[in-house]
Amino acid sequence: TWLAGGTGTKGHVVLNVLEDGKNRLSVLTPSASGWTTSAFVGAPSFGIVGVGDVDSDESDAVWLTVTDYLTPTTLSLAEIGQPPEQLKSMPAFFDASGKKIEQHFATSKDGTKVPYFLVRPEGLKYDGSNPTLLYGYGGFEIPMLPGYSGGVGKGWLEKGGVSALANISGGGEYGPRRDQPALNAHRPQA
């Protein structure tokens, strides 16, 4: 878990935290008794999120950019405490209806929990017969985040395939302390 960014508005601070390979937005609000924390209304469960203030001197509005495995990059405007209003979107290159994003955790030999994302058709039977495209990367503290790919969507997901992305050690999703034990001779533990 690490701070990926944040912004201030007239009455709040919005923190963008990378947690288990996905962004999570939190709203911090000052009061006479200290700060309170709440979830950002309408933030996606899985995806890459960018947040920036519109005019921090005058309003509590923020710009949001969001993308995930099934959603091309979108630009939205949100007032703190209200759901975002989508303003623009990049074109969709495949039909994402009937598809679902999930996150699971595998356990490595040393007991480390390794998050992975699964993009699959709804109603999928877990019987081992589903063609699956698995990608895992962990190096140079470069995180693999949930992003949109028209090629994977059109060429694989639309045809009923399953896509999996593993956030293995080394990718920086949990910082250098998590990555160090999986270097050199210990790389198979990743």
Describe every region a protein language model picked out:
Residues 1-7:
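Generic long, charged, amphipathic alpha-helical segments
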Residues 10, 39-190:
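Serine-hydrolase catalytic core recognition
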Residues 14-21, 28-30, 63-69:
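Beta-strand C-termini and the immediately following turn/loop, strongest in propeller blades
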Residues 30-33, 79-81:
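Short loop/turn segments that connect beta-strands within beta-propeller blades
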